[in-house]
Amino acid sequence: MAHQVLQPKGWPRPPGYANGVVAQGRMVVLAGQIGWGAEGLSAQIGQALANIVTLLREAGAGPEHLLRLSWYVTDMHAWREQQPAIGAAYREAIGKHFPAMSVIGVSELVEPEALVEIEAIAAMPDSNLS
């Protein structure tokens, strides 16, 4: 079992994320990723997600192994306004895999130019051990 999405009977299916995920296997925990050098929120999101995919590949995993993404965003108004571009950046990097997610508005991040930081947790089946 790679993972199982938790979808209680009678709950509406959330758009673009899962309320919960059950998984077993080798854990991959990634530090927060930012969009180094990218201009604007959606571009920084695209770069941060590409960084996450690169790190997953380094571990022998892929986007399909993601269990959770925690997004820290400095401008929630821009987040809401740019949903189409953010969705496109997400689909380009991750595809149609939707792990558990939280989006948290913050006043600032450690890097002054960073508009978003994304942390990731993934689990690979034990057969992916190297």
Language-model features: where?
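Short, polar/acidic, helix-capping and beta-turn segments at strand->helix junctions
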Residues: 2-130
